[in-house]
Curated annotation (Swiss-Prot):
The gene is fau-1. Keywords: Endonuclease, Hydrolase, Nuclease, RNA-binding, rRNA processing. SMART domains: S1 (SM00316). It is an enzyme of class 3 (hydrolase). The keyword Hydrolase applies. Probable RNase involved in rRNA stability through maturation and/or degradation of precursor rRNAs. Binds to RNA in loop regions with AU-rich sequences. This is Probable ribonuclease FAU-1.
Length: 466
């Protein structure tokens, strides 16, 4: 039996379900990293998804398979409670509109109420209307939400969906050509729509998924063919849909899940208890566990790799240079796009320069199309910026000597120590602004020990560039 698992309980539930002999499929990236062996990208008979409030999970799928998963999960602890949904996902109803709200209508289904967004109906919806609807998103019983409805009848899956009344493959990930590559056809009167996950699935897996969807479509056809029109029978259920069960995890159950997860990866006490409480706290849990999981990083004073993976900066984002001055001012040297983030603490950013004037100490003009590439490294007393023109030709390098760089999620901060080193396009190297450093010492802005450190760094950088 195949199961797809998502949410904050995924690691523990993947372990539990695999031990119970079930095959976990369509695993997320972190799950693939934590477990040995490959996970197939094929149709899931059951999907286990964490609820939006993270208090439990929904188990949705084929009836026998969902029952087996539910039975295993209810064994977690005595405070795991479960309820079958009276308006299960995929169920089809003749319903009566009882109220119209700002964005949709409330529909009496007989088994309960549902919410039909106006965008999910091709026709105008008014109070008193009767119409055929399908549950597309079920709602846990402990929430205030109603199940979400749609007037389009479909067999919805993570690899593909079949839409009743369509006659062709819907353009998308696979498009019509996909049907030429697999050994299956959609049921007559139904069109297939390929989901993004189908890109990673094998042709055999797609064919099997389409066969299963066809079986479900046949059951729907049998329920609807010859059935009374909604105006003659509402409210009533035409088709029972997929098994939908909600499980609430209590405190004991969450701690039991901690123990299971701990068999797979570093897990702090109360992992699931904390994560269930707040999304911000969830991020803190991930951070702490990442520190514990990889202590041998070679980082002696600061866990840079873990911190940036959790909070940034990240490739494609932006990072500014918070250029402090010894007199207490702070100048922001623009934002650059992050090109790379290395575990050793190095972040590379690029900035496009505005034309006009010349580059400090280099004496070359700033021109349209110029690019500045800056490499900052956590804890280093200097950083280089290489200037290139629009053709990629180097115009010069400016090395700023500063207090040790600190790289925060959105800015790299330091205090400029005045003395700098430049390397011209012709290879000439010079040290500049020693007089400004001396003046800052005289004014009391920089201590003599700090100034001596700056001079030592500048000398070492100059020697390395020559």
């Amino acid at each position: 039996m195949t199961v797809r698992v998502r949410g904050i309980y995924a690691t523990a539930l993947t372990r539990l379900l695999r031990e119970a002999g079930h095959e976990v499929v369509q695993a997320s990236g972190p799950i693939e990293d934590r477990f040995d062996g490959e996970f197939a990208d094929e149709r899931a008979a059951v999907t286990v998804t964490t609820t939006d409030d993270q208090q439990g999970v929904g188990v949705i799928g084929d009836h026998d398979a969902a029952a087996a998963v539910t039975d295993r999960l209810t064994e977690l602890g005595r405070d795991t409670l479960h309820w079958s949904d009276p308006t299960p996902e995929g169920a089809i109803y003749a319903g009566t509109v009882t109220d119209t709200l700002g964005s949709g209508a409330v529909v009496d289904l007989g088994d309960g109420e549902g919410f039909l967004p106006y965008s999910s109906s091709d026709e105008r919806v008014e109070t008193g209307d009767t119409l055929r609807v399908q549950v597309v998103e079920a709602s846990a019983p402990w929430t205030d939400g109603r199940p979400v409805l749609d007037t389009t009848v479909a067999v919805r899956g993570s690899l593909l969906s079949l839409v009743r009344g369509e006659t062709a493959s819907t353009p998308g990930t696979g498009g019509p050509a996909m049907l030429d590559l697999i050994a299956a056809e959609p049921r007559d009167g139904w069109g297939v729509s390929w989901e993004s996950a189908s890109e990673d699935a094998s042709f055999d897996a797609l064919a099997a998924a389409l066969d299963a969807a066809n079986d479900r479509a046949a059951a729907i056809d049998a329920s609807l063919d010859g059935a009374d029109a909604p105006e003659d029978c509402a409210p009533t259920r035409y088709d029972e849909g997929r098994s939908t069960v909600w499980l609430w995890f209590g405190r004991e159950s969450r701690f039991a899940l901690d123990e299971v997860r701990r068999e797979v990866t570093s897990t702090m006490p109360g992992h699931h208890r904390v994560k269930a409480g707040d999304r911000a706290a969830s991020a803190a849990v991930d951070y702490v566990e990442a520190l514990c999981d990889d202590p041998e990083t070679g980082e002696t004073d600061f866990p840079f790799a873990v911190t940036t993976r959790q909070f940034g900066p990240q490739v494609g984002g932006s990072l500014s240079l918070g250029h402090g001055k010894p007199d207490g001012r702070l100048i922001t040297l623009g934002n650059g796009e992050v090109q790379s983030v290395d575990d050793d603490g190095t972040v590379t950013i690029e900035r496009e320069m505005s034309p006009g004037g010349t580059y400090d100490a280099l004496g070359v003009p700033k021109e349209a199309g110029d690019i500045a590439e800056t490499k900052v490294k956590e804890g280093r007393w200097w950083y280089p910026t290489v200037y290139r023109d629009s053709d990629g030709e180097k115009k010069g390098t400016y090395v700023n000597v500063c207090t040790p760089v600190e790289i925060f999620p959105d800015t790299a901060r330091y205090v400029d120590l005045h003395v700098d080193v430049v390397k011209h396009a012709d290879g000439a190297v010079e040290r500049v602004d020693d007089d400004e450093l001396d003046a800052a010492v005289e004014r009391g802005h920089i201590s003599e020990p700090l100034a001596e450190r700056a001079r030592s760094v500048a000398a070492a950088v100059k020697s390395a560039l020559e």
